[in-house]
Amino acid sequence: WIMGHMVNAIYQIDEFVNLGANSIETDVSFDDSANPEYTYHGVPCDCRRWCKKWEYFNNFLKALREATTPGDSKYHEKLVLVVFDLKTNSLYDHQAYDAGKKLAKNLLQHYWNNGNNGGRAYIVLSIPNLSHYKLITGFKETLKNEGHPELMEKVGFDFSGNDNIDQVAKAYKKAGVTGHVWQSDGITNCIASFIRGLDRAKEAVANRDSSNGFINKVYYWTVDKRATTREALDAEVDGIMTNDPDVIADVLNESAYKAKFRIATYDDNPWETFKK
């Protein structure tokens, strides 16, 4: 999965997919009452990027639905996965359940079209804080109460805080999550990736590949250089988040990687651990 980073304006959906992304990451900011409000990152953000592009969340969802609904004039067949980077650090811990509930209602109405031929992309809810695990509970229970528990088949999870992997496992246990787990690891592109290294990403890959691991997929962020792309591929990650999808696509075309990796399509289940 080539994951376009910080896609917060509607026009950027086309821009990133046309550069080679089959997945996008979108920031979601919340108001004081835990309503998802804007697709907005704000300052500071990655180097060489404009941090302040935004849309109203529901307007973005409608555009995303068009981009991922077969037969729509805006449809992109290859856009198959969307990561919502949920900026819940602005909320109190006790608001996490409400944030999940309100997020589910927004997605149900504006993305899934109340279960009636809505967008088809798989969705990852990426949460920055382990203590906000109740967001998952609120999301799940709301879809069930609204009569659409089947939509959870399209939803996965990520805790994005670079926490100790054992602690991440405990948070999932509390949330009752037993699958659909993506694990992110990384650092802003403003800091050279070698300073962080790939140790934790490799630890996540080892968990993914072990018989008793809880992780299904691992992605590394934010990668804009060819050398770092190669290192991440050598570590056998499933996804790379990038500001430059064309760079990742180029490296995947190199002879060393062409035979080993391919770009994921809609038929590749993002919740299944890939067996070599």
Swiss-Prot record:
Q: What Gene Ontology molecular function terms does this protein carry?
A: lyase activity; metal ion binding; phosphoric diester hydrolase activity; toxin activity
Q: What are the EC numbers? A: 4.6.1.-
**What does it catalyze?**
an N-(acyl)-sphingosylphosphocholine = an N-(acyl)-sphingosyl-1,3-cyclic phosphate + choline; an N-(acyl)-sphingosylphosphoethanolamine = an N-(acyl)-sphingosyl-1,3-cyclic phosphate + ethanolamine; a 1-acyl-sn-glycero-3-phosphocholine = a 1-acyl-sn-glycero-2,3-cyclic phosphate + choline; a 1-acyl-sn-glycero-3-phosphoethanolamine = a 1-acyl-sn-glycero-2,3-cyclic phosphate + ethanolamine
Note describing how the cofactor binds: Binds 1 Mg(2+) ion per subunit.
The answer to whether keyword Lyase applies is yes
Q: Which UniProt keywords apply?
A: Cytolysis, Dermonecrotic toxin, Disulfide bond, Glycoprotein, Hemolysis, Lipid degradation, Lipid metabolism, Lyase, Magnesium, Metal-binding, Secreted, Toxin
Database matches in Pfam families:
GDPD_2
Keyword Secreted listed? The answer is yes
Write down the superkingdom of origin: Eukaryota
Glycosylation positions? 129, 253
Tissue/organ expression: Expressed by the venom gland.
Q: Which cysteines are joined by disulfide bonds?
A: 45-51, 47-190
What processes in GO biological process is this protein linked to?
Answer: killing of cells of another organism; lipid catabolic process
> What's this protein's family per the entry?
Belongs to the arthropod phospholipase D family. Class II subfamily.
This protein's name = Dermonecrotic toxin LsaSicTox-alphaIB2i
